[in-house]
């Protein structure tokens, strides 16, 4: 029986999730086993640090081709609310209704990943997202009563395991009118590019279209990209890095 993974990126305007079907376990066992110390650049030019070495790049390409997206969604939980700047009760009710509507899918998932919200550090804390994430986590705890265990999944796993550079430079942004401007690259932009790269290599035009349509509707493209990369990072940790 195939395994399914669901990954959530939490937000009141963008409550996104992706469900992936995991490749057969034999697929992971047949891949070259590259020791962890030999996977990423640790020395050399600044822009290469953290990116995968050639041998592991080949493994990553094969790894990310093994899984398959079976569902990608992005819901606006503020529908029907009167004040979008606070967490009205209606937002939580909307979240529960969304989760209930996909209950048969959650029943088939072997892993439930919820992106962990940062509660420390110098960056601004998104307290609304933290509260929503906790309610989402509690929903699955209550629903499955120990038969399934939701995981608070740190964001750094997807960037570290999939080879995001430790230092970002600039990118040339091209506008519709043909004008260009140099912008600072970052992890969010990298994640969106990486997700599109994976889907392009898979030939998954349906999921790419879903992501693009959300972007055109001003829903954040990177939320669904993050969900996809969480599924891929979890697959590396759980199925590739387990003892062969």
Question: Which residues make up each language-model segment?
Answer:
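Phosphate- and other anionic-substrate recognition elements at nucleic-acid/protein interfaces
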Residues: 1-244
